Design a protein with these regions (language model features):
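Short acidic-glycine loop/turn motifs at beta-strand connectors
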Residues: 66-69
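Structural signature of tandem-repeat unit edges
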Residues: 1-32, 40-62, 73-89, 98-112, ...
């Protein structure tokens, strides 16, 4: 814009409620304020994508990660089905404050789900856990419904093998 390179996406006001997807180019290096990307400002967003070639953030299945790694950077607030990249450990607050989230798919290769990994997801119905998970903390779910199904094995989707 006018000779300036935009490298940060920081919202001062909430996005309109009809915005369902965000797409970030290779120039974007950060979202929102440190530690709270877009928090409370993008409540209708269901998916977020990053252009290939961005060295600082990447996306997969509508979720943004740090670099090309497995550390979650931003999960859209209105996402309903979350497929996480394989990560050794799903730590505290990896998934939090997602009011519309109904399903979580943990990818094969993940071994540990720590306490409070999934927090404040009031619509959560089920979590698919692969065979590779050998430790799932009894308090991994916090402020989530008491009747969340934990399904070990298949996701029921032909292209996702666990």
């Amino acid at each position: 814009m006018a000779g300036f390179k935009i490298s940060s996406f920081l919202l001062e006001h909430s996005l309109p409620s009809n915005v369902r997807q965000l797409y970030f180019g290779t120039n974007i290096q950060s979202l929102g304020t440190q530690g709270y990307p877009l928090f409370g400002r993008a409540n209708s967003v269901e998916e977020a994508f990053v252009a290939p070639g961005n060295r600082l953030i990447s996306s997969q299945d509508g979720v943004i990660y740090h670099g090309t790694g497995t550390n979650v950077y931003y999960i859209p607030t209105a996402i309903r089905r979350l497929v996480l990249k394989p990560m050794k450990v799903i730590g505290k607050n990896t998934v939090y404050d997602l009011p519309q989230l109904e399903e979580i798919v943990i990818s094969e290769g993940t071994t540990t789900v720590e306490p409070y990994a999934f927090e404040s997801c009031p619509s959560l119905k089920r979590i698919y856990v692969p065979q590779s998970v050998t430790s799932f903390a009894k308090d991994a779910l916090y402020r989530c419904p008491d009747d969340v199904e934990i399904l070990k094995g298949s996701t029921g989707i032909h292209h996702v093998t666990m």
